[in-house]
Amino acid sequence: MQEYYIGPDLNTQLAALLQKLNVTKVFLVRGKKSYTSCGASDVMDAVLNGRGIKTVCFFDFLTNPRVEDVRKGVHLCKSQCPNIILAVGGGSALDMAKLIRYHIYKETDSYIPLVVIPTTAGTGAETTHFSVCYINGEKQSIADSAMLPDYAFVCSELTSHNDAYLTACTGFDAVAQAIESYWSVNSTDESRSYSLKALGLLWKQLPLLIKNLDNKELRSEVAEGAYYAGRAIDITTTTAPHAFSYKFTSLYGIPHGHAVALTFPYFFALNLYGERLQSTLDSYEYGQRMKLLVQFLDADRSDFLSCQLHMSTYISSLGLSAKALTFDELASAVSSFNEQRGRNNPVVIDEEVKSGLQNYFMELKESDKE
């Protein structure tokens, strides 16, 4: 069971935890420039140096962690014998720390407590039991209970350095997580309660935050909403929009949240209509669930295109678009997607769905010419 803290005064809360755990040595997995620019370095210096805690830093890894980077981190961490692993950064830093702890546990049966502090709002890495890692250029999702952080601190002040684009990418990832978890075949009463709680903090607030980046109240709500979106997908995992997103990142360098947004309007409409559902779903219950989601998001469900346009308009308000990619680049996702995530989707992903997605991309590029 994870312990978590959401709010200000990170210094006091973290210091109290370190004292409780009798920490004398920390293996710190962190970002590079962002670690200083977000103010985390000042907080960590004050808390760790103030208690005389020895710190070993690891930041020698790419933005999208590779298995080679994980091996380097595992080797260094094992050689240092820390009391805890502390991760401070965006999704990549947190995933790296989770993978390091997981591999050490599997190799040595030694369980090192993991404390995470996200500096972006939206990846969900602080509250999930899975991580992503690139193996031979392919993005793999690895799930295990040993990757769930033991402690998470969500402090919105550390996200205040995020510019509009980063805020949009990570924030929309959280919105997508909440919605995908809600319609997932693995959805439960608990996960749906987390999804709706997340959307109540994200849906209206995120576009406002993009236009008012210095608004502390909006920052706080979005950070909290992102945490609960992570709680939701920790139960259900993600669905089709995530399944089709990975190639956009690995081949074309599109940040993850932006990559998810590229297909989201199509799958939003497809899943709200709910034709050709997975056999495990009750069509009446699913239909009632989608009615509530439509009301919650104030969406137009009068026809497929109106539903699709509703989400497209929302994503455009965040400044995210497909203009940077050609039709061929967009279409590459159709033939290459994560089948495991695809099976979580409420509507069966078959050739007709893939053809519909390709037509959607074609319409996108035609609209770019206008």
What residues fall within each predicted segment?
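C-terminal and late-domain segments of enzyme folds
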Residues: 168-228, 232
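Short Gly/Thr/Asp-enriched flexible loops that form oxyanion-binding sites at enzyme active sites
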Residues: 43-44, 72-74, 93-108, 128-130
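Short, amphipathic C-terminal "tail helix"
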Residues: 327-370
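A glycine/threonine-rich phosphate-anchoring loop and its flanking beta-alpha core
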Residues: 102-190, 281
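ATP/NTP phosphate-donor binding region
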Residues: 1-84
